[in-house]
Design a protein with these regions (language model features):
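Nucleotidyltransferase catalytic core that binds NTPs
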Residues: 3-181
Length: 181
């Protein structure tokens, strides 16, 4: 099993990054190699703009559910489309490096699309995970209308799972606290 933390970035950054940064296609080769060896991949995605305890616990739990964890980060442009002007606070390559430093994350990639669906389709992880606060119904089951990636996962027979939100720990709450709100 790999113990190195590999950062996989968008192609345009490949020439300016350290040798352990790879393009999406190389990530797919590595993920598929591990899947063929019988390992269960876990995939999650998000902006992860200001890292906090809720993120860390979420990612640790995601990693426990499989043999390796792939984290797909929204690019700066994608984050702005989702969160609005002024975001992200931390540039994508810095977010990627920060996330790759966490021992629970095996692979990091950056995606620019509106959703991670195309990347999920390429990698076909055994398990797709999202935070329960993000996409659950009142009974705690995944709300497929809020999880566009879930349809992709279901098409190839993967599992969609939710991880409970850690109350009081969110990027929105952290930003409000910093602003004195």
């Amino acid at each position: 099993m790999w113990s190195l933390h590999n950062i996989y970035c968008k192609e345009e950054y490949f020439m300016n990054t350290p040798p352990n940064y790879y393009m999406r296609d190389e990530l797919a080769i590595e993920v598929h190699r591990r899947q063929q060896a019988g390992e269960r991949g876990v995939f999650t995605n998000g902006c992860f703009d200001l890292l906090h305890l809720g993120h860390v616990r979420y990612l640790q739990e995601a990693r426990r559910r499989g043999d390796f964890l792939v984290l797909a980060l929204n690019s700066d442009a994608s984050t702005r489309r989702l969160k609005g002007p002024g975001r992200p606070y931390v540039p994508e390559l810095e977010r990627a490096e920060i996330m790759a430093a966490l021992s629970c994350i095996d692979y990091v990639t950056i995606f620019d699309e509106p959703t991670a669906g195309p990347l999920v389709s390429l990698l076909q992880p055994a398990i797709y995970i999202k935070g329960g606060d993000y996409a659950s119904t009142q009974d705690g089951t995944p709300d497929m209308s809020r999880l566009p990636e879930a349809k992709v996962v279901q098409e190839y027979g993967g599992s969609v799972q939710l991880i409970s939100y850690l109350p009081g720990h969110s990027t929105t709450a952290l930003i409000a606290k910093i602003r004195g709100e």
